[in-house]
Amino acid sequence: MKRNILLPTDFSKNSWHAILYAIELYKNNHCNIFVLNVFSAVSNSIDSLINMEPGSELYERAKSNSEDGLAKVLDMIAFREEYNSKHTFIPISTLNYPLEAIKNVVEEKDIELIIMGTKGEIGSPKVVYGSVAMYVMEKVRNCPVIVVPELAKHTLPKEIVFPTSYKTHFKKRELNYMVEIAKICHAFIRV
């Protein structure tokens, strides 16, 4: 059975790093890998969503840039020496708020795991997690999230930390993914 994995990207080095990490993590598994780019035309996404309509010049230009960026990412993956035929890459370009787009794709494509970078294209060196990564970790409750640190090596983890206050009840499905990843990596789980 193929896994459905979501890789949000803003075309930053950090998101590319997370894509490579995901490919390495699931190199022995058959996967549908959805590469998502959420576009807008201006830095203020509220103005962008209000002012952009399909067919408008602003919308079409932003969508074209997004689709071109996704095509470049897929080309970069295809040209890698360790290109894996077990992986099917599906690009998704959409106009939305990043968190809402991620939630929609998780639901529509039956996503089992989100793997993303910690910081986006305009990430500050003083910030550990970008705002999108933080929102996804906090707000996406029906799908596990792996956030790959900017300087993480492309080696798989030997230890997985599971932080808990013991007040939250976790579903078996949520814990199964962590156990599966621990098995893939031959890693210990520390609570």
List PLM regions with ranges:
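Gly/Ser-rich helix-loop-strand patches that form or flank binding pockets
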Residues: 102-153
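Short, charged helix-to-loop "capping" segments that act as catalytic/coupling loops
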Residues: 81-86, 137-153, 163-172
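Short, solvent-exposed amphipathic alpha-helices that sit
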Residues: 21, 65-76, 101, 174-177
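A short acidic, glycine-rich active-site loop
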Residues: 54-68
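Structural beta-alpha unit
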Residues: 75-114
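General small-molecule cofactor/ligand-binding pocket signal
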Residues: 34-36, 90-94, 146, 190
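Small/aliphatic-rich secondary-structure junction motif
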Residues: 1-56, 159-191
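Inter-domain helical "communication" segments and dimerization helices
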Residues: 46-54, 72-85
